[in-house]
Amino acid sequence: MVQYKYSVNGTLIANVQADGIITSTATGSTAYALSAGGPIISPGYKGLLVVPVAPHTILSRALVLSSSDVLELEFLGEYIHEASLFLDGQVLNLESTPSHITCQRGEKEVLFACGGGDFFQNVASTFFQGTKE
């Protein structure tokens, strides 16, 4: 469990005690963020998604940020030395766990080659299998 607070554009949003926190782009919204209770986001969306992982309060919810928003995370408490930091599913081997992390949209875009098919057709067949016309 970790304790952290997060701010958007300098405004404190919440102090959270949870198993972790996920920040994601639209591309990652159908992965771990979705399983933690986050929404499915259209691939054209340029902002960030923030999802607390198993928070210890029912009031902690996913938050969708715009492309110009800056997310600041500050990890608190005694458990920070036991926390792991992952980037795209890969653990980052850092000498020490950072106490502050800033997330914002980069200057350059990354293009992904998709396996074909319409995004919403794929969403419908994958996540809403019982839906028939």
Predicted segment positions?
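Catalytic phosphate-donor-binding core of small-molecule kinases
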Residues: 1-18, 22, 30-133
